[in-house]
């Protein structure tokens, strides 16, 4: 009896579907309901991708080698897996589903791969540069909840790249610069000296950078400054502020992290302009930026 192409396709489809069903069923005894949901859904979607693109064995071997390389380059100073998540938009999608907009709360964005625990503390009005080079920038604002109440003693972690586009952890000398933490005062106010952010490329010497090059994608990030803000009873905020007027805003951000509400004016101040705290800047420009932070309730 002659077998038609349709019959052959249906037989192949049935073989593939039986495998999917078998793998999904293998998780039926999982006692944690959320873990069961995650593993079964992941299995269905992963197999659907393989079937849709007709993934070859060589392609899958290359994918495994790529993920192995991502793991091998990752250490306590470089998080290549976070970078991979960022450039695929997974980080921003997770943020979108996990941190829905709430009233006037400040919006979240990506964490990024360059956060380091135990950054040094600076006092209010202190300088986070720590010897890093860049245009001095005064940043100030108030931390409140969504009812407008000031939040005293909020812990504010800040970190940024230098004017050459590098974070301290990208240098091999163990320096700590361009990062610190501080606490808001009794009225929720905070202030510090940093550097005017500049755009920079994400690392291109690792597998993620090579992936972007292979797909003709730009590695550039829009100029930004990182914040992570924590306070009792309020939702932890991970966010950036972006520089209004940065040409990279029009070209796009390699990790899809820009939100309009986070674009802020960094107002250039000519040489000789008095600084808010009387600091002597010398014969150079500096900038200032105001960024008020609104924290959502921990439970929404």
UniProtKB/Swiss-Prot annotation:
InterPro entries: Catechol_dOase_N, Intradiol_dOase_C, Intradiol_dOase_core, Intradiol_RC_Dioxygenase. Keywords: Aromatic hydrocarbons catabolism, Dioxygenase, Iron, Metal-binding, Oxidoreductase. Fe cation binds at residues 167, 200, 224, 226. It is an enzyme of class 1 (oxidoreductase). One of its GO terms (biological process) is catechol-containing compound metabolic process. Disruption phenotype: Cells lacking this gene completely lose the ability to grow on 4-NP, 4-NCA, and hydroxyquinol. GO terms for molecular function: 4-hydroxycatechol 1,2-dioxygenase activity; catechol 1,2-dioxygenase activity; ferric iron binding. It catalyses: benzene-1,2,4-triol + O2 = maleylacetate + 2 H(+). Its cofactor is Fe(3+). It holds the Pfam family Dioxygenase_C. SUPFAM superfamilies: Aromatic compound dioxygenase (SSF49482). Its EC number is 1.13.11.37. Binds 1 Fe(3+) ion per subunit. Induction: By 4-NP. Pathway: Aromatic compound metabolism; Xenobiotic degradation. Belongs to the intradiol ring-cleavage dioxygenase family. Involved in the degradation of para-nitrophenol (4-NP). Catalyzes the conversion of hydroxyquinol to malelylacetate. This is Hydroxyquinol 1,2-dioxygenase. It comes from Rhodococcus opacus.
